[in-house]
Swiss-Prot record:
Name listed for the protein in its UniProt record: Conotoxin TsMLCL-04
Keyword terms: Disulfide bond, Neurotoxin, Secreted, Signal, Toxin
Post-translational modification: Contains 2 disulfide bonds that can be either 'C1-C3, C2-C4' or 'C1-C4, C2-C3', since these disulfide connectivities have been observed for conotoxins with cysteine framework V (for examples, see AC P0DQQ7 and AC P81755).
Signal peptide bounds: 1-19
Record remark: domains: The cysteine framework is V (CC-CC).
Native source species: Conus tessulatus (Tessellate cone)
Record keyword Signal present: yes
Tissues expressing the protein: Expressed by the venom duct.
Pro-peptide positions on chain: 20-60
InterPro entries, A to Z: Conotoxin
Record lineage: Eukaryota, Metazoa, Spiralia, Lophotrochozoa, Mollusca
Length: 74
């Protein structure tokens, strides 16, 4: 009969210590997703193409506004 209270006390102490499987699964998925996002890299060729297009457009706009200031003399 003395074992029953001891068993109940141990059961009460052990149950909050057990991890919630759903919570740990969600945390594991979030960590994995963060690592995959950090591993993604921008395509350098794409970025160079965008920058080149912006430079060309800015040069055309600048030359149409002020020829003496922006456009190099040929």
């Amino acid at each position: 009969m003395l074992c029953l209270p001891v068993f109940i006390i141990l059961l009460l102490l052990a149950s909050p210590a057990a991890p919630n499987p759903l919570e740990t699964r969600i945390q594991r998925d979030l960590i994995r997703a963060a690592l995959e996002d950090a591993d993604m890299k921008t395509n350098e060729r794409f970025l160079e193409g965008v920058i080149s297009t912006i430079k060309d457009f800015a040069g055309k706009v600048c030359c149409s506004v002020s020829v003496n200031f922006c456009c190099p003399t040929a």
